[in-house]
From Swiss-Prot:
Its main location: cytoplasm. This is tRNA-specific 2-thiouridylase MnmA. One of its GO terms (cellular component) is cytoplasm. Catalyzes the 2-thiolation of uridine at the wobble position (U34) of tRNA(Lys), tRNA(Glu) and tRNA(Gln), leading to the formation of s(2)U34, the first step of tRNA-mnm(5)s(2)U34 synthesis. Sulfur is provided by IscS, via a sulfur-relay system. Binds ATP and its substrate tRNAs. One of its GO terms (biological process) is tRNA wobble position uridine thiolation. Interacts with TusE. Pfam families: tRNA_Me_trans (PF03054), tRNA_Me_trans_C (PF20258), tRNA_Me_trans_M (PF20259). Residues 97-99 are annotated as: Interaction with target base in tRNA. The keyword tRNA processing applies. Coiled coil: none annotated. The gene is mnmA. GO terms for molecular function: ATP binding; tRNA binding; tRNA-uridine 2-sulfurtransferase activity.
Length: 368
């Protein structure tokens, strides 16, 4: 193949997806090396932090495949460009998605630059479940073949240039196939469970972790009717649509239906709740998004029909998108949607193609 001599640096996380990605690229004739990124300085020796075990697994896989493993420390870049923004958003009462920020600032910026400049790479590769297709000289981002594992939601900030320099080998496979390949090869990561922790926190307890950096401020929990029914330990621990962990049961006069967070009054440190997962206060007819990133990097003007996800693993929502100005859009859903959360990302699709997205600035509530 013509790509034979091309050098690919695979971001090795110590998980099964990046392990199999490295092997697949070897089979395709690339010159493959691995890179393990250290993005967080463990300052606590907590058992939740799995970085050392992940590095050992990445090294074992590279040894088995006969490829070199480089390591790099991006902790300073991570702190400045991901973590501080993450804390600022929480402080402002919003719910950010750090994995999206990490992909934008670390995996497809710091890693991409380091691989090209320091390691002489032609491409980088990751274990993300997405695909790329080159159309009219521009690379497009497509959903992963395994719709259950598709991760395009987390990669919407990438430009066509970044996608052109990236390979996503497992995006063409389904997860069970990936595990089967790892088992057949005898890789230590074959049965390792997928990480669920936020990228820098690993599997540790989120509330405890956040409390170290942002002092919690307890406040009132009130109903949509204005009745005080409890106390929250800090607005930052709660997100719209949340049901668990509120510590309140049904009220004497009310029903036994569960309570849901419908609003956060940051100014007065009040958590607003209502009963029922389809309460009108939980529903939105649309949203305003900002900090837009379109994969083709063409400015968006006018209006378009497409579908949107306002959180990961959500079913696509048909919608109409209208440009408000250079960096803001209005999105109107065909049907009302529950728990649209400021700080999270709205990501747009045309069929299999991920068009891009933006940060939800505000939700447009159901008219009362």
């Amino acid at each position: 193949m013509s790509e034979t001599a091309k050098k690919v640096i695979v971001g090795m996380s110590g998980g099964v997806d990046s392990s199999v990605s490295a092997w697949l690229l070897q089979q395709q004739g690339y010159q493959v090396e691995g890179l393990f990124m250290k993005n967080w300085e463990e300052d606590d020796g907590e058992e939740y932090c799995t970085a050392a075990a992940d590095l050992a697994d990445a090294q074992a896989v590279c040894d088995k495949l006969g490829i070199e493993l480089h390591t790099v420390n991006f902790a300073a870049e991570y702190w400045d460009n991901v973590f501080e923004l993450f804390l600022a958003e929480y402080k402002a009462g919003r719910t950010p998605n750090p994995d999206i920020l990490c992909n934008k600032e670390i995996k497809f910026k710091a890693f991409l630059e380091f691989a090209a400049e320091d390691l002489g790479a032609d491409y980088i590769a990751t274990g993300h479940y997405v695909r790329r297709a080159d159309v009219d000289g521009k690379s497009r981002l497509l959903r992963g073949l395994d719709s259950n594992k598709d991760q395009s939601y987390f990669l919407y900030t990438l430009s066509h240039e970044q996608i052109a320099q990236s390979l996503f080998p497992v995006g063409e496979l389904e997860k069970p196939q990936v595990r089967k390949i790892a088992e057949d090869l005898g890789l230590v990561t074959a049965k390792k469970k997928d990480s669920t922790g936020i990228c820098f926190i690993g599997e540790r307890k989120f509330r405890e972790f956040l409390g170290r950096y942002l002092p919690a401020q307890p406040g009132k929990i009130i109903t949509v009717d204005g009745d005080e029914i409890g106390e929250h330990q800090g607005l930052m621990y709660h997100t719209l649509g949340q049901r668990k962990g509120l510590g309140i049961g049904g009220t004497k006069e009310g029903t036994e239906e569960p309570w849901y967070v419908v609003d956060k009054d940051v100014e007065n440190n009040i958590l607003v709740v209502a009963q029922g997962h389809e309460h009108p206060r939980l529903m939105s007819v649309g949203l305003i998004a900002q900090q837009l990133h379109w994969v083709d990097r063409e400015p968006f003007t006018g209006t378009m029909r497409c579908s949107v996800k306002t959180r990961y693993r959500q079913t696509d929502i048909p919608c109409t998108v209208k440009a408000l100005d250079d960096d803001r859009i209005e999105v109107i859903f065909d049907e009302p949607v529950a728990a649209v959360t400021p700080g999270q990302s709205a990501v747009f699709y045309n069929g299999e193609v991920c068009l891009g997205g933006g940060i939800i600035e505000q939700r447009l509530p159901l008219p009362v």
